[in-house]
């Protein structure tokens, strides 16, 4: 079984530019206030549907607040058969200072 990889925002952006799926595991209100453009909100309610419809081999970047919770979520996705999973170090807080123009508001992309 493969393991997830921890990456900095710059590598997450490079993967994103190549079409990686970005999932955000922060709470819904925080996600709606500001998130990475094109990211999908993932929580206990949307997780099953996300896994059912996902390409398990597609690069998938998991984002949280500071890069801690995303590691658990990334490990869970690997356990569900995802083969190319990344946890972004520094989380959205580091992302928004590194790539402020690559953010969006609203509940879905």
Swiss-Prot record:
<dbReference type="Pfam" id="PF00581">
    <property type="entry name" value="Rhodanese"/>
</dbReference>
<dbReference type="InterPro" id="IPR036873">
    <property type="entry name" value="Rhodanese-like_dom_sf"/>
</dbReference>
<dbReference type="GO" id="GO:0004792">
    <property type="term" value="F:thiosulfate-cyanide sulfurtransferase activity"/>
</dbReference>
<comment type="function">
    <text>Transferase that catalyzes the transfer of sulfur from thiosulfate to thiophilic acceptors such as cyanide or dithiols. May function in a CysM-independent thiosulfate assimilation pathway by catalyzing the conversion of thiosulfate to sulfite, which can then be used for L-cysteine biosynthesis.</text>
</comment>
<dbReference type="InterPro" id="IPR050229">
    <property type="entry name" value="GlpE_sulfurtransferase"/>
</dbReference>
<dbReference type="GO" id="GO:0005737">
    <property type="term" value="C:cytoplasm"/>
</dbReference>
<dbReference type="GO" id="GO:0006071">
    <property type="term" value="P:glycerol metabolic process"/>
</dbReference>
<keyword id="KW-0963">Cytoplasm</keyword>
<comment type="similarity">
    <text>Belongs to the GlpE family.</text>
</comment>
<keyword id="KW-0808">Transferase</keyword>
<feature type="domain" description="Rhodanese">
    <location>
        <begin position="16"/>
        <end position="104"/>
    </location>
</feature>
<feature type="active site" description="Cysteine persulfide intermediate">
    <location>
        <position position="64"/>
    </location>
</feature>
<dbReference type="InterPro" id="IPR023695">
    <property type="entry name" value="Thiosulf_sulfurTrfase"/>
</dbReference>
<protein>
    <recommendedName>
        <fullName>Thiosulfate sulfurtransferase GlpE</fullName>
        <ecNumber>2.8.1.1</ecNumber>
    </recommendedName>
</protein>
<dbReference type="InterPro" id="IPR001763">
    <property type="entry name" value="Rhodanese-like_dom"/>
</dbReference>
